[in-house]
Amino acid sequence: MNLGEKLTEGKTKIVYAHPNDPTLAIIIHKDGISAGDGARRHIIPGKGALSGRTTANVFTMLNHAGVATHFVAAPEPTVMIVRRCVMIPLEVVNRRIATGSYIRRHPDVAEGTRFDPPLLEFFLKDDARHDPQISPEEIVAQGIASADEVEQLASESRRVFLLIEEAWAAQDIVLCDLKIEFGRDASGALVVADVIDNDSWRIWPGGMKERMLDKQVYRNMPVVTDDGLEQVRRLYEEVAHRTDAWVNR
C-alpha cells in the first residue's frame, strides 16, 4: 500500500504518515525480536505478520468493549492503520502474578504471588537508562502527564488488563502481566496505542510457568539457535491463532 513519510522506526515496527489523511498513521510490523533493551536481536521470518494479527485481534476486541484505542483497521497482516497520536513515553504495567523483573526488584516476594487487585507500575521509556520505574508523582512533576491523566492511565490500563485476562481465562491461560502504552489523539484525549502482542505479556497455560507461550521463552535462551527461533515462531503462531477466537465469537 502507499505510504507517507517515515515518522519513526523501532526494533519491531515502522510508523509512517498516512498518504491521504493527516489524522491517520500506518504501522508496519517487522520480523525483528529483541531482548535486554536491544542487546539481543534476531529476525524471525513471519513474526511481523503474526504480531500484527495478534495486535489487530486484541485492539478489535478492545474497541468492541468500548475502550478508546488508536486502532482503525488492519488491511494486511503486517499493516495497521491507526489514529495518529503523540505517544506518552511511559510503559504502563499491570501485574497479576509476581514474576520477571518484579521478583528481581523485590526478592522478598515469592514468584507466583498473586496480586488482587492487579499491581500497577509505571516505567519511563528510556533504553539508555533501561526503562527506569517512575512514580505517579514524578510523572506529574516531570510534565509527562497531568494528575488527572495519571489516574486515567491507571484506570484504563486496569480495564484493558481485566478484559484481556478474561479472554485468556476462557482458554485456561493465566495472564501474569501486561505492558501497554498510551498516546494523545488529535483532540488531546488519551487512547491505548502502540501494539499489544506476544511481546506485551506473560501468559501461562494452566497457570504453569513451564508452559509459557510468550516472549520470555526467547529471553530465557542461554544461546539462540535456529531451532530455538523456530520454536519461538511456533509460539507466536499459536498465540495469534488463539486470539483469533476473540474476534470470531
Swiss-Prot record:
GO terms for molecular function: ATP binding; phosphoribosylaminoimidazolesuccinocarboxamide synthase activity. Pathway: Purine metabolism; IMP biosynthesis via de novo pathway; 5-amino-1-(5-phospho-D-ribosyl)imidazole-4-carboxamide from 5-amino-1-(5-phospho-D-ribosyl)imidazole-4-carboxylate: step 1/2. GO terms for biological process: 'de novo' IMP biosynthetic process. Keywords: ATP-binding, Ligase, Nucleotide-binding, Purine biosynthesis. InterPro entries: SAICAR_synt/ADE2_N, SAICAR_synthetase, SAICAR_synthetase_CS. Its EC number is 6.3.2.6. The keyword ATP-binding applies. It holds the Pfam family SAICAR_synt. It catalyses: 5-amino-1-(5-phospho-D-ribosyl)imidazole-4-carboxylate + L-aspartate + ATP = (2S)-2-[5-amino-1-(5-phospho-beta-D-ribosyl)imidazole-4-carboxamido]succinate + ADP + phosphate + 2 H(+). Belongs to the SAICAR synthetase family. This is Phosphoribosylaminoimidazole-succinocarboxamide synthase. The lineage of its organism: Bacteria, Bacillati, Chloroflexota, Chloroflexia, Chloroflexales.
